[in-house]
Amino acid sequence: MNIEILSIAKKERSIYDPLCKELSKMISRFAKIEDIELFNKDVTKAHTISPEASREAYSKLFAPHVVKSFNVILHPDGKLIDSYEFSKLLDGKIAVKFFIGGAYGFEDEFLKKGDSIISLGNITMSHKIAKVVLLEQIYRGFSILSNHPYHK
């Protein structure tokens, strides 16, 4: 299985990088995983214009990546699911892509392209923390599917 985590983010070092690296290593026993951070001058410019312009810039940046996979969009208004339901998102898939939006979320048109729209909870968190939570849930999901004791 191939997993891609795509996020709107500047490529910069973070205190969360070692944890993301460790979780990715744990996941690599089950699947190939790739972390893709996207950001360009159009996003920078859009941030100075309006939230709507920002959402449009995010959609354009993500658009080429919404192909040939099961696309999961993380969104505050998405479905709240538990770890067992999350594991079903991974079960039997060849490729799964997770999309973490920027500060202004997603355009409605982009949300329609998702195969599943989920929420990590009702609290607001930075995309860096959302990525850590997502990675942990991916590992937990594979642990559930393979009856690994990590989940207990």
UniProtKB/Swiss-Prot annotation:
EC no.? 2.1.1.177
Any single GO molecular-function term of the entry would be: rRNA (pseudouridine-N3-)-methyltransferase activity
Reaction(s) catalysed by this chain, per the record, are: pseudouridine(1915) in 23S rRNA + S-adenosyl-L-methionine = N(3)-methylpseudouridine(1915) in 23S rRNA + S-adenosyl-L-homocysteine + H(+)
Q: What enzyme category does the UniProt record give?
A: transferase
The record's subcellular location field reads: Cytoplasm
Q: Which CDD domains match?
A: RlmH-like
Q: Which UniProt keywords apply?
A: Cytoplasm, Methyltransferase, rRNA processing, S-adenosyl-L-methionine, Transferase
Annotated residues that bind S-adenosyl-L-methionine are located at L74, G101, L120, G121, N122, I123, T124, M125
Q: Which domain of life is it from?
A: Bacteria
Instruction: Check the record and name the SUPFAM superfamilies matching this protein.
Output: alpha/beta knot
Task: Supply one GO CC term from the record.
Answer: cytoplasm
Into which family does the record put it?
Belongs to the RNA methyltransferase RlmH family.
Q: What does this protein do?
A: Specifically methylates the pseudouridine at position 1915 (m3Psi1915) in 23S rRNA.
Q: How does it assemble?
A: Homodimer.
Name it.
Ribosomal RNA large subunit methyltransferase H
